[in-house]
Amino acid sequence: MEVRMDTRFWGPSGWRLLHLVAFAAPTLNKRYLLQFFQNLPYVLPCKFCRASLTEYYASDPIPTDTKEFANWLYRIHNRVNGKLREQKLITGKDPTWHNVKQRYEKWMKQSCTQQAMIGWDFLYSVAYTTPCSDVTSTPIPGAPLHPATPELKNRWNTMTIAERLPKLKLWWESLPHILPFPVWKKAWLKAVPHVPKLACGRKAVTEWLYHAEKAMCQELEENAPHDSFDGLCNELNTFSSGCSKIKTTKVKTCRAKKTLKRKSLDRNRTRKYFATGGFL
């Protein structure tokens, strides 16, 4: 069975990192920036999110001018929020562009001592959903028999492992080069000298990222969010979702059932959230 992650687990973490990257875009290596965003729809840890982002890219393509990335991602984020509102999963209004711009530009100006590495929940969710050789993709209901392009295959979740792994490899390769703060990039390139061995499966990739997190946090002289690899795996398993088994067109977002175990982890994560400055 495909493993997918609850969007409430990785979404906030992912959006914060992506928006920071978008605001830093004019200062980043354009080749890696494009490589990162071009492969993003293929690596998201929820098949419905991959499908939606593929559609959003088609109607609002990645800009060629790096100065336009911040506003482009703001529009993409609002499209996602619109989908969630239609599903009655959120009710709030979209923030104004002025408020978003003000918030992230202020963050970009913070000193190095205030720039704790963020995005780990998102990165771990990508790692934990690395496709394995013994798992086949479950097409989204309504999928055509033979989608002709990578975009259509991604839209309908019919990509083979051989087709998806190269996308993941390119994405992981680009990651350190598009980190929004120079201190993060320098620490990652020093502490994490290679990309994960994707063919070894999700456990190996997750373990690689766990060691990367430890090395990064040591390099940045900050506390690591996770105390042990077993504890991390327990947390990821608790927030994994069964959306791969869904055979209806009504559900369009991966969500895990709430359990006592998850509620307990939520409380622990909340404490860590504030201990790390509000970002995981």
What are these regions (language model features)?
Residues 1-43, 47-280:
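Mid-to-C-terminal functional-domain signal that highlights helix-capping/loop sites
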